[in-house]
């Protein structure tokens, strides 16, 4: 079973104007005119299922993103409706899609939305984007106390952040305290906490069955620095082979020069260290290791 633990489904009106303007400004500079003409911040469940079928992905975890409270500009479609949209996607494709609650824990009604999502809509976890707060801040502990009661995975964006968010809040060191303070919280550090990869791996060694990571975003390393891609992935497998989860960050990471969704899955299926790494004494990726990344680890974590 191939499981992608990091995808997003949304309509454009679920993003604030400030966010949309920023995205389109960046894309206008980085995409060709032909690519920009086709670019859209629209990623429906049906579009996702088509890409999953083409790539051979069996199950994807859909993560709502709540930027709006931090940027003080709410989108036309509220975060409540964005979460309900994910719940409806899960209901429409119950064997293919798993929905998480996505909410900024600083919101006054964050716990209300969490309870609605888990109890009434049947969502299976939580997505947190700590772009302007530390997960250990006292003002959000009431949220994590409630989340701890549900005994569900919480996926945290980790590592570098887009403007206007601050990278310091994505340091995985703060997951260490949370993992000890809330014994039922299963923390997933997204993107191998890019920028803090070694620190995250060290934390995971000492917090087995408490902290996991997903490899969404490593597509950038694959295209820009094969050296970093292979050494980073090999290092995590050597240290925490049962805690690495496959992620794609669909639909955000699929435009050239990054591999498409289908190409990314194929890269991981065919994962093979070039000879230069083997000559240095590094171990070749085994079929067992590749299968753990592609889905076996996620299957155990999610109870599938």
Predicted regions and their residues:
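Active-site gating/metal-coordination segments in enzymes
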Residues: 63-170, 212-214, 219-221
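An N-terminally biased module of ancient metal coordination in phosphate/nucleic-acid-related enzymes
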Residues: 1-77
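Distinct, well-ordered alpha-helical segments
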Residues: 108-118, 137-143, 164-181, 195-206, ...
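Histidine-centered catalytic micro-motifs
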Residues: 2-12, 154-159, 189-192
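Active-site neighborhood of phospho(di)ester-bond hydrolases with catalytic His/Asp-centered motifs
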Residues: 2-5, 63, 100-102, 127, ...
């Amino acid at each position: 079973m191939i499981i992608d633990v990091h995808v997003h489904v949304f309509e454009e009106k679920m993003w604030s104007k400030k966010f949309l303007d920023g995205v389109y400004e960046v894309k206008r500079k980085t995409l060709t005119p032909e690519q920009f003409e086709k670019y859209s911040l629209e990623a429906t469940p049906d579009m996702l299922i088509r890409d999953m079928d083409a790539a051979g992905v069996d199950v994807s975890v859909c993560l709502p993103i709540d930027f709006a409270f931090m940027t003080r500009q709410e989108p036309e479609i509220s975060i409540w409706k964005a979460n309900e949209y994910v719940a409806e996607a899960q209901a429409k494709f119950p064997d293919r899609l798993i929905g998480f609650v996505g909410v900024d824990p600083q919101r006054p009604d964050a716990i209300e939305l969490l309870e609605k999502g888990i109890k009434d809509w049947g969502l299976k976890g939580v997505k947190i984007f700590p772009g302007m707060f530390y997960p250990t801040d006292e003002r959000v502990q009431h949220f994590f106390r409630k989340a701890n009661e549900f005994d569900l995975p919480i996926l945290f964006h980790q590592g570098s952040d887009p403007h206007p968010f601050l990278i310091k809040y994505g340091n995985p060191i703060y997951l260490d305290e949370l993992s000890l303070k809330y014994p039922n919280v299963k923390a997933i550090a997204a993107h191998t906490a890019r920028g803090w990869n070694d620190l995250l791996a060290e934390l995971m060694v000492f917090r087995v069955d408490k902290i996991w990571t997903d490899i969404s975003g490593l597509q950038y390393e694959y295209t820009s620095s094969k050296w970093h891609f292979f050494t980073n992935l090999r290092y995590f497998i050597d240290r925490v082979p049962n805690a690495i989860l496959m992620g794609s960050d669909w639909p955000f990471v699929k435009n050239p020069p990054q591999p498409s969704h289908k190409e990314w899955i194929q890269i991981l299926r065919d994962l093979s260290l070039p000879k230069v790494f083997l000559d240095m004494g590094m171990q070749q990726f085994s079929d067992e290791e590749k299968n753990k990344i592609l889905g076996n680890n996620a299957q155990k974590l999610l109870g599938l």
